[in-house]
Amino acid sequence: MTNFRLNVLAYSVMLGLTASVAYAEPTNQPTNQPTNQPTNQPTNQPTNQNSNASEQLEQINVLGSDNNNDNTPPKIAETVKTASQLKRQQVQDSRDLVRYETGVTVVEAGRFGSSGYAIRGVDENRVAITVDGLHQAETLSSQGFKELFEGYGNFNNTRNSVEIETLKVAKIAKGADSVKVGSGSLGGAVLFETKDARDFLTEKDWHIGYKAGYSTADNQGLNAVTLAGRYQMFDALIMHSKRHGHELENYDYKNGRDIQGKEREKADPYTITKESTLVKFSFSPTENHRFTVASDTYLQHSRGHDFSYNLVKTTYINKDEEELRHTNDLTKRKNVSFTYENYTVTPFWDTLKLSYSQQRITTRARTEDYCDGNEKCDSYKNPLGLQLKEGKVVDRNGDPVELKLVEDEQGQKRHQVVDKYNNPFSVASGTNNDAFVGKQLSPSEFWLDCSIFNCDKPVRVYKYQYSNQEPESKEVELNRTMEINGKKFATYESNNYRDRYHMILPNSKGYLPLDYKERDLNTKTKQINLDLTKAFTLFEIENELSYGGVYAKTTKEMVNKAGYYGRNPTWWAERTLGKSLLNGLRTCKEDSSYNGLLCPRHEPKTSFLIPVETTTKSLYFADNIKLHNMLSVDLGYRYDDIKYQPEYIPGVTPKIADDMVRELFVPLPPANGKDWQGNPVYTPEQIRKNAEENIAYIAQEKRFKKHSYSLGATFDPLNFLRVQVKYSKGFRTPTSDELYFTFKHPDFTILPNPNMKPEEAKNQEIALTFHHDWGFFSTNVFQTKYRQFIDLAYLGSRNLSNSVGGQAQARDFQVYQNVNVDRAKVKGVEINSRLNIGYFFEKLDGFNVSYKFTYQRGRLDGNRPMNAIQPKTSVIGLGYDHKEQRFGADLYVTHVSAKKAKDTYNMFYKEQGYKDSAVRWRSDDYTLVDFVTYIKPVKNVTLQFGVYNLTDRKYLTWESARSIKPFGTSNLINQGTGAGINRFYSPGRNYKLSAEITF
């Protein structure tokens, strides 16, 4: 990565800081300036959310207050959830965050959990996600990559999550608007802001909090600790939380078919740990200057079994097995930041915030194939029950091992292990002869580990040369020893080279072999943010201006690891390769046998993607102009300059396989010779060089310059009526994999396309809101038009050219490429309302009723449905709060309509042999009832209880249904019968409990 250089933003800050000295006027400080007193601490200084002034959150005490009785009319297409609301609704993950939001759902990703959000007909990378102004990891969105790899569970191709306990506020913005976050906000954006010490120190100079919780749906336990304090000019916050649980249990989980394969009815078993630590340390030398150093880390670790993996030898879990597919996945995020805030009023700003952040995100999928370590494992099998006692091998009865030539049931004489009465030992499966192996003792064969065997005493061996010879039992002294790394080994060497002396051991490896594949997707970001606000009056018109910029460098790379090794050796496992015939130690290079214990192998790092560094330079401004008491206008503009710079360095960067790119654009030179079939013969060096030349050809710089805008108006003709309109534009630049991903195979070749254009969206929306002390009722109509959608297009059959213009291959290649092809339109209507019953009936003070509703419909060009559109959804809420907030409760009734066949599209319907393109397995309509309550027996203790799916309804969400794959090895069902679909159903009746104490 190139050096993180200063840009024009840094110089403007330096100029502004100089100006702040000259224009500092303490007597004219605004009322919300920070001081060392808690009552004046602002909790919502501008971040890189880049919202205009009218959209800035009002200062709130997010811990002590609850917006459950808030009558403020909602902003158009926007939902804001404070920490108190998240706590009240017992939100523990992204699914809970949008549980009672209509028009927003979480994208399901099977074994890897969730992957971002779906809003307005688009999902994942088309819905921006930021944490404290930093974009979170994007998925590899190339459709070609998804078709090749996503159905097989080899990549954790998901968007990372956040820890809910650390959040000050979560804002969900629906509709295209890149003024706020830049690239990615096509369907909307989800913006998170973390807490700091000021949010806790509103009444005193210290705070201690502890929270414990439990959820039955996934058996998740929560422990969270919060420490905050202030001393003179310093304040600090430490928050640590740990969640430990299991898989989300589907409906009727306990009675589901516990088998392997795609027809499995139970959710695959996983042990999931989520751990988060947020540390912020601040220094305020004066009331106008504040410096903060912060560290925000989040780790999600999941281990378990892919029992639903389709490539299994048997559906029965309790049968003998060679290996089982294990998962060991993680998502890790770490952000270290430095922030400077200035609240001195100058001609250029009222508030200034300058921050530098360094974030690293890793999403890892690790698959390990091994047996679980019991006697059913082939590598541990010991059917004869041979034992090691006092350094000697004995039979299952504890007697010395006896080997005889015995006639078997087929009339053939074979070596068999017998008891002291010369009767062959029985075995549960197979034959006695197959259950043991005679290890030949000699310097070039088998050595005993003297830390396990007693090498000072004679050992029993059997002399025979062929398997049909009567073995001769002997006791021999181990006459050859050697020492390796301080460990002693011994064997026996006969004076007659024709003699063969064998030691009887179980016929298995004696250790646990493990094959692994580990795929890392790494996103590294270095970013500078500058955000300023200024309130001023021009020609008697009030303006609230926010402006600033971003300079960021982001590197996206893939690192693949693979290999095998052995572990957990038993007493009979080989511990050394022995010596060669030349009397030197035998090495793994010389040994042709597979031995993961003695010769583990870890492949060199590889990749399917060229690493790409993305440089983003952005400038923005947003102004809320109050033209009249009844009319205000919002104007927003943003300019983004985004450059992609591939960074493939041969020998340093993880290697891209030569066969994926060779001859793709640059042909091989004329061959020096031909094989016996007349095919040209190239040296490995020629092939390597040609692959590097093709990568260099593919790795071209790409630059995008985009303008975004947002126009809005708010009209209040009456004190109870508000009309809002909004017209905004969003965009998403192609991801690096969409531009550069390359794959060469006769059946499926993908070409890179550096000529793609950014996707665009234009959003039109109008909202009508009635509001008063009794509450509010708001309805809005929206339409979003998308263009330049990126999709995978079939280019036909082609043949690569050789150096003289002829065909390079014997057969044509089926060629695909990412291109801008589709347009789309989504339209719909939403309702959001709240009624305070106490306004009409004094005795019912504290009661409220709410209602939310979303209906949307969308089509791509060619009348193709958009699968990311949610079915019609409504949420009715009934709540109560004690006037002193000692207790309260909420009842939610959610109704979701069925997903109609005409509103779904299966892009693989022809390959599956279907006549129509509708998705075969869809969600039906369902109604859910949830009840949540809290009680504060004393001021500093809060107890919460929630019951979800109160009526124990069996239901399948559309997001879960559309996560079912039509091909591959993971997330499958029997498409013909539907067997296995129960695994995708949501939990039945489940509960959440929590207790929190604060001081």
Curated annotation (Swiss-Prot):
Which residue ranges does the record assign to the TBDR beta-barrel domain? Answer: 203-999
Q: What is this protein called?
A: Probable hemoglobin and hemoglobin-haptoglobin-binding protein 4
> What does the sequence similarity comment in the record state about its family?
Belongs to the TonB-dependent receptor family. Hemoglobin/haptoglobin binding protein subfamily.
Q: Which residues form the signal peptide?
A: 1-24
Residues of the TBDR plug domain: 68-195
Motif mapping: TonB box: 58-65
Question: According to its UniProt record, what is one Pfam family this protein matches?
Answer: Plug
Q: Where is this region: 6 X 4 AA tandem repeats of P-T-N-Q?
A: 26-49
This entry carries the following GO cellular component terms, namely: cell outer membrane
Q: Motif TonB C-terminal box in this chain: where?
A: 982-999
Question: Would you say which domain of life the source belongs to?
Answer: Bacteria
- Coiled-coil stretches are none
Biased composition of type Low complexity is found at 26-50
UniProt keyword Repeat present: yes
Q: Which InterPro entries match?
A: Plug_dom (IPR012910), Plug_dom_sf (IPR037066), PT (IPR006970), TonB-dep_rcpt-like (IPR039426), TonB-dep_rcpt_b-brl (IPR000531), TonB_Hb/transfer/lactofer_rcpt (IPR010949), TonB_rcpt_b-brl_sf (IPR036942), TonB_rcpt_CS (IPR010917)
What GO biological process terms are annotated to this protein in UniProt?
A: siderophore transmembrane transport
Region (Disordered), start-end ranges: 25-52
The molecular function terms of the Gene Ontology recorded here are:
siderophore uptake transmembrane transporter activity
Cite the entry's keywords alphabetically.
Cell outer membrane, Membrane, Receptor, Repeat, Signal, TonB box, Transmembrane, Transmembrane beta strand, Transport
Q: What else is known?
A: This protein is subject to phase-variable expression associated with alteration in the length of the CCAA repeat region. This mechanism is called slipped-strand mispairing. Addition or loss of CCAA repeat units would change the reading frame and result in introduction of stop codons downstream of the repeat region. This may be a mechanism of regulation and a way to avoid the immunological response of the host.
Q: How does it sit in the membrane?
A: Multi-pass membrane protein
